[in-house]
Swiss-Prot record:
Protein name per its UniProtKB record: Large ribosomal subunit protein uL4
Role: One of the primary rRNA binding proteins, this protein initially binds near the 5'-end of the 23S rRNA. It is important during the early stages of 50S assembly. It makes multiple contacts with different domains of the 23S rRNA in the assembled 50S subunit and ribosome.
Region of interest: Disordered: 38-72
GO cellular component, one term: ribonucleoprotein complex
Sequence similarity: Belongs to the universal ribosomal protein uL4 family.
SUPFAM superfamilies listed in its UniProt record: Ribosomal protein L4
Description of how the protein assembles with itself and partners: Part of the 50S ribosomal subunit.
Organism the protein comes from: Pseudomonas entomophila (strain L48)
A molecular-function term among this protein's GO annotations: structural constituent of ribosome
Length: 200
């Protein structure tokens, strides 16, 4: 199949990488697994056994008329522990490489179908100036965009760093969440070829 290049002739690309069907279930699984892998999972609360104190019983077992109590650190006491306290846990989910790559292929194909993939021969800025990059993107009618190149250009990265709706990634750093989060994906021809190598 062919992909139209913004500032040059169309290029021939792999049907497998850029022309497959959209598998919503698989993409959802990949996104959930990716997001879950980014969770810290370090939240921790104290149970009745973790809270300091409470060793001596507050009053004797019998004779006071009050309900029996053996500690002041039970969950029903002020200053006591939490009933079902949160513990550190690993939220990561297993996703096979084959499935992850298939999800990326599915996303790329859907970007092409929905006209959200803008292919250019090359994309760079001469100096790390945010204003220059903004003018360049506005000239192309892009304001909410992910820029994907073969290797991240330092000037481009610095110029885009302060723009809230612009992100710069290389092919290796592109993930399912970043690829679907932006209105448009601006990708260089060399990055297209790299995607074909990795996912073909």
């Amino acid at each position: 199949m062919q992909l139209n290049v913004n500032d040059a002739q169309a290029i021939e690309v792999s049907e497998l990488t850029f022309g497959g069907e959209f598998n919503e279930t698989l993409v959802h699984q990949a996104v959930v697994a990716y997001m879950a892998g980014g969770r810290q999972g370090t939240k921790q609360q104290k149970t009745r056994s973790d809270v300091a104190g409470g060793g001596k019983r507050p009053w004797r077992q019998k004779g006071t008329g009050r309900a029996r109590a053996g500690t002041t650190r039970g969950p029903i006491w002020r200053g006591g522990g939490v009933t079902f306290a949160a513990r550190p846990q690993d939220h990561s989910q297993k996703l096979n490489k084959k499935m992850y790559r298939a999800a990326l292929r599915s996303i790329l194909a859907e970007l092409v179908r929905s006209d959200r993939l803008v292919v250019v021969q090359d994309f760079a800025v001469e100096a790390p100036k945010t204003k220059d990059l903004l003018n360049k993107l506005n000239g192309m009618g892009l304001n909410d965009v992910l820029i994907v190149s073969d290797a991240v250009d330092q000037n481009l990265y610095l110029a885009a760093r302060n723009l809230p709706h612009v992100d710069v990634r290389d092919v290796q750093g592109s993930d399912p969440v970043s690829l679907i989060a932006y209105e448009k994906v601006l990708i260089t021809v060399s990055a297209v070829k790299k995607f074909e190598e990795l996912l073909g």
